Amino acid sequence: MGAQFSKTAAKGEAAAERPGEAAVASSPSKANGQENGHVKVNGDASPAAAESGAKEELQANGSAPAADKEEPAAAGSGAASPSAAEKGEPAAAAAPEAGASPVEKEAPAEGEAAEPGSPTAAEGEAASAASSTSSPKAEDGATPSPSNETPKKKKKRFSFKKSFKLSGFSFKKNKKEAGEGGEAEAPAAEGGKDEAAGGAAAAAAEAGAASGEQAAAPGEEAAAGEEGAAGGDPQEAKPQEAAVAPEKPPASDETKAAEEPSKVEEKKAEEAGASAAACEAPSAAGPGAPPEQEAAPAEEPAAAAASSACAAPSQEAQPECSPEAPPAEAAE
């Protein structure tokens, strides 16, 4: 439109009236609300408005139609058309979010200054606000889903992986420690039992040996005393030999009778020694205490007691028959 008017303006002053007439004639026919190539926000395309616009243009500079057309064009461009305002305001809403360039910020500023209360601007702002509000909602909706997913994954990790590993390690450690501890305690207990048993056996063996020695000592003393008495008997028996000589046959019978009780006493002594050895046998179970060593001291007092028991009847028999007393002792 501006180019067409500039071409007509070059023909002469008569062209000055044509733009107004053309505007008046063309304005009623434009039902879509377009004028000078721009969209009107209010949709007012009445001929009165067109005439007023044409008169203002003619009054501004009637002698220079070309300048008149250029100035309205400049004014229209500077006033920022409604379409530019519509486009600028959504850009303004998007600018703070995306950090728009200064050029975009200037354009929306002009658009807002030109038509701040236009419905389209309000609609654009509402749309931008809705988009801005919806975008956080979308972000919120997107963020909860990963947040919900991540805790599930974490729960799975905690419940299955970490706890299972920890429980596995703990069970393994417990089993190993329990096994090692049990094994260590078992040998310790066994060693303690062995030591206790060995100590008890050794103590019993020592006690038995001591008792055997004590019993053997008096037995030996008694035997020594009996031997001394037996040694002194022959001296006393010498004067009696003459009186006893004719009685040799009955004396021999008496010696036999004396030997029989001595044998019985020997058997009793052997049985007593066997019983003592049997009593001390359990104590010999401990290590380092062989039964032979304990049985030997037990047999010694038994032998001493047997010898003393045998010596007594021999002494009794010696006064009766002194010549046969030494062979009786030798036989014993």
Swiss-Prot record:
One of its GO terms (cellular component) is focal adhesion. Keywords: Acetylation, Actin-binding, Calmodulin-binding, Cell membrane, Cytoplasm, Cytoskeleton, Lipoprotein, Membrane, Myristate, Phosphoprotein. Residues 1-332 are annotated as: Disordered. The keyword Membrane applies. Residues 26-35 have a biased composition (Polar residues). The modification Phosphoserine is found at residues 26-27, 29, 46, 63, 77, 81, 101, 118, 128, 135, 145, 147, 159, 163, 167, 170, 262, 314. Residues 73-102, 110-136, 197-227, 272-332 have a biased composition (Low complexity). Residues 250-271 have a biased composition (Basic and acidic residues). It is a lipid-anchor. Detected in spermatozoa. A lipid is attached at G2 (N-myristoyl glycine). It holds the Pfam family MARCKS. Phosphorylation by PKC displaces MARCKS from the membrane. It also inhibits the F-actin cross-linking activity. PKC-mediated phosphorylation increases 4 to 5-fold upon TNF-alpha or LPS induction. Induction: By TNF-alpha and LPS in monocytes. GO terms for biological process: actin crosslink formation; actin filament bundle assembly; actin filament organization; apoptotic process; central nervous system development; mitochondrion organization; neural tube development; neurogenesis. Residues 152-164 have a biased composition (Basic residues). Membrane-associated protein that plays a role in the structural modulation of the actin cytoskeleton, chemotaxis, motility, cell adhesion, phagocytosis, and exocytosis through lipid sequestering and/or protein docking to membranes. Thus, exerts an influence on a plethora of physiological processes, such as embryonic development, tissue regeneration, neuronal plasticity, and inflammation. Sequesters phosphatidylinositol 4,5-bisphosphate (PIP2) at lipid rafts in the plasma membrane of quiescent cells, an action reversed by protein kinase C, ultimately inhibiting exocytosis. Interacts with CDC42. Interacts with GTP-bound form of RAB10. Interacts with calmodulin/CALM1. This is Myristoylated alanine-rich C-kinase substrate. It comes from Homo sapiens (Human). The gene is MARCKS.
